Amino acid sequence: MKTLLLTLAAATIVCLDLGYTLKCNKLIPIASKTCPAGMNLCYKMFMMSDLTIPVKRGCIDVCPKNSLLVKYVCCNTDRCN
């Protein structure tokens, strides 16, 4: 019985996410990745010439400022990009 309880406890610890980790979409939205520590935002980058198709997605620590050529959209929830 003790072995069963220890096994269940170990499985629970392994399955739990003990620290919050953000998941962001990669370039293809069906694929996501877990962001490393310190990267607490997801982003999409668009070329200003075509705001309908993102050219890059991923994790980032600070949302960059938009420029004349590039627009960034940042968010902070799982797979929000």
UniProtKB/Swiss-Prot annotation:
Biological source species: Naja atra (Chinese cobra)
InterPro entries cross-referenced by the UniProt entry: Cytotoxin_Cobra, Snake_3FTx, Snake_toxin-like_sf, Snake_toxin_con_site, Toxin_cobra-type
Pfam families, per database record: Toxin_cobra-type (PF21947)
SUPFAM superfamilies: Snake toxin-like
GO cellular component, one term: extracellular region
Compartments where found: Secreted; Target cell membrane
Family: Belongs to the three-finger toxin family. Short-chain subfamily. Type IA cytotoxin sub-subfamily.
This protein's name: Cytotoxin I-like P-15
GO molecular function ontology, one term from the record: toxin activity
Signal peptide positions (record): 1-21
Entry keyword RNA-binding: no
Tissue: Expressed by the venom gland.
Quaternary state and interactors: Monomer in solution; Homodimer and oligomer in the presence of negatively charged lipids forming a pore with a size ranging between 20 and 30 Angstroms.
